[in-house]
A protein has these predicted regions:
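Short, compositionally biased low-complexity segments
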Residues: 102-109
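N-terminal secretory signal peptides that target proteins for export/translocation
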Residues: 1-10
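Sec/Tat signal peptide C-region and signal peptidase I cleavage site
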Residues: 24, 28-30
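Bacterial N-terminal signal peptides
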Residues: 13-24
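Acidic, serine/threonine-rich low-complexity disordered tracts
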Residues: 30-101, 143-229
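Surface-exposed beta-loop interaction hotspot
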Residues: 109-148
């Protein structure tokens, strides 16, 4: 005797649809990718910048391609950096992580092994400044002091940032926009010898421009501009 046909539950029919909707609801929306043009003298290249948010932290991934170079940092929403990684193939993959008033660096940097601890104080660690300076630009705070890692040497340096008001700036592709300006300098006696400037879009804090010199007198100025506004 042939078995009677199985009776199909209405739930079985809609189960795939329910699961699909559940996965769509759980998935985070794709983080927007911003493109920037960096120019130093006659040299220029484009890099990408992406901010991925999680529940109570912000993970900022900056992908910069001049050859093969990648920056990845894990920050609090207030801009403080908890961990950072810098990869430049084939000989650099270095990680930094904060533990109290110490930052441990490990990995390889330009072919040499790195395993060291640098002592700081209770000032925040900012990396990258294109994200970490955003609260200063938007919240009306006048100044802040912080630590940051020099990418070319892995040295931790103390810096000072000052809000410098708002102004309209030209964009590479698009109309003028209102931007909040932040000026950074080395903390202490060297503060009068070097400075750089950041601009953040007034409406949402997105980094839109940088201007500074990376070298001795006579070095061409470096300008970074948002391409996708």
């Amino acid at each position: 005797m042939n078995p009677s046909p199985a009776r199909h539950s209405p739930f079985q029919a809609i189960l795939p649809l329910c699961l699909a909707l559940l996965f769509m609801a759980a998935a985070s929306p794709a983080a927007p990718v911003f493109r920037y043009l960096e120019q130093t003298g006659t040299d220029s290249f484009i890099f990408t910048w992406r901010l991925e948010r999680e529940r109570d932290t912000a993970t900022l991934s900056v992908v910069q391609r001049q050859g093969s170079e990648t920056f990845l940092s894990r920050n609090t929403p207030a801009g403080d950096t908890l961990a950072w990684q810098y990869v430049h193939q084939p000989d650099t993959d270095v990680r930094a992580e904060r533990d109290g008033d110490r930052i441990r660096l490990s990995g390889r940097f330009r072919g040499r092994k790195v395993d060291e601890v640098q002592t700081i104080d209770d000032r925040p660690w900012f990396q990258p400044l294109s994200f970490s300076l955003r609260p200063l630009a938007l919240n009306g705070q006048a100044t802040t002091e912080f630590w940051t890692i020099r990418v070319d040497t892995l040295e931790l340096v103390a810096m000072r940032a000052e809000a410098a008001g708002r102004e309209e700036i030209h964009t590479v592709r698009g109309p003028r926009l209102a931007a909040a300006k932040v000026v950074i300098r080395p903390d202490g006696l060297l503060g009068g010898l070097w400075r750089a400037e950041y601009w953040f879009r007034a409406e949402d804090g997105q980094f839109v421009r940088y201007r500074g010199t990376h070298g001795p007198p006579g070095t061409p100025e470096t300008v970074i501009s948002l391409l996708d506004s």
